[in-house]
């Protein structure tokens, strides 16, 4: 089964073609990071306008490599995300579905990130615990044997990725904050400053990062003699400790020995280091997508679309964008 996937939920425009849920035929992504850097974050209207410019170009390049008549299913993200951005990809996918006379699958962006891990780990089977951690989301979920997903914990305020962006801005490091702090922190001491770990010891699976961000803000206002590298490393250590502790606690309490980590923050080198260390000590299997599939991409959309199509799940063409969609 050949699936064409389209992703435009935020600031990446992406098109991919995937055969049988595993063989990559085409994988194109155009990032808008440089466009939004001067704003310090993603501007929704600007993102949508760039999708309108980039998507036709990517589809044209895709169909230079793939005969459109060989596509069996068209899939696109319909939420959650920025509504204007979502509508660009969703509308294009519906148009292709009509013109090619092929079925259409709407894909949940969060579910798509989970499917990214299957591309690199084809032997992974549910049930497993997954931490979805990105600029827009921080959620702990259980993936059931039928591939349905249950949210068992979520952030009550900022996402982890949002906290990275805001602290990077406080430190004058620029945007996007996640990869910049990751790199700067390698030159710092993660034990230099003791920042709070909100909700880490509470008997639930929810998160809160707003207080940690505020603690860094007050620290910077109070202290004058500090190294940016040490602050970045100490802040990152606090975030990673919270994510690791909550995720392994959920897996332990559910009696599940397999854990996946997905989303942009799953690319963080310190998170991967501490996860792998604990998994080795505690006897868990852990799974990450490759770095290229942690951020938004269309391969994960095509993979999620494949799974639904394989089960005969298709969507009507009146499906609308849902910026607040949940799993």
From Swiss-Prot:
Alphabetically ordered keywords of this record: Acyltransferase, Cytoplasm, Iron, Metal-binding, Transferase, tRNA processing
Cofactor: how and how many bound: Binds 1 Fe(2+) ion per subunit.
GO molecular function terms listed in the Swiss-Prot or TrEMBL record: iron ion binding; N(6)-L-threonylcarbamoyladenine synthase activity
Residues that, per the record, bind substrate: 132-136, 165, 178, 182, 268
Domain of life: Bacteria
Subcellular location: Cytoplasm
Biological process, per Gene Ontology: tRNA threonylcarbamoyladenosine modification
Protein name (database record): tRNA N6-adenosine threonylcarbamoyltransferase
């Amino acid at each position: 089964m050949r699936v064409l996937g389209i992703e435009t939920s935020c600031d990446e425009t992406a098109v991919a073609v995937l055969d049988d849920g595993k063989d990559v035929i085409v994988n194109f992504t155009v990032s808008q990071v440089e466009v939004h850097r001067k704003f310090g974050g993603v501007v929704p209207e600007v993102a949508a306008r760039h999708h309108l410019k980039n998507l036709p170009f990517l589809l044209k390049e895709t169909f230079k490599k793939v005969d459109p008549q060989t596509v069996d299913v068209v899939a696109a993200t319909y939420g959650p995300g920025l509504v204007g951005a979502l509508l660009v990809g969703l509308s294009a996918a519906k148009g292709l579905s009509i013109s090619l006379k092929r079925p259409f699958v709407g894909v949940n962006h969060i579910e798509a990130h989970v499917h990214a891990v299957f591309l690199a780990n084809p032997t992974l089977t549910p049930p497993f615990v997954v931490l979805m951690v990105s600029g827009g989301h921080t959620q702990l979920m259980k993936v059931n044997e039928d591939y349905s997903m249950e949210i068992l914990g979520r952030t009550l305020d900022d996402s982890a990725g949002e906290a990275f962006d805001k602290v990077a801005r406080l430190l004058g490091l620029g945007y996007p904050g996640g990869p910049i702090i990751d790199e700067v922190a390698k030159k710092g001491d993660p034990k230099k400053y003791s920042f709070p770990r909100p909700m880490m010891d509470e008997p639930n699976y929810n998160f809160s990062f707003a207080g940690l961000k505020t603690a860094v803000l007050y620290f910077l206002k109070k202290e004058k003699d500090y190294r940016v590298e040490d602050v970045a490393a100490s802040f990152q250590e606090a975030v990673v400790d919270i994510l690791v502790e909550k995720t392994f606690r959920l897996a332990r309490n559910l009696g599940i020995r397999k854990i996946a980590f997905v989303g942009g923050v799953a690319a963080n080198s310190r998170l991967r280091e501490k996860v792998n260390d604990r998994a080795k000590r505690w006897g868990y299997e852990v799974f990450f997508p490759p770095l290229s599939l942690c951020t938004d991409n269309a391969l994960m959309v095509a993979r999620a679309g494949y799974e639904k199509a394989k089960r005969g799940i298709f969507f009507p063409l009146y499906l609308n964008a849902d910026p607040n969609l949940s799993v």
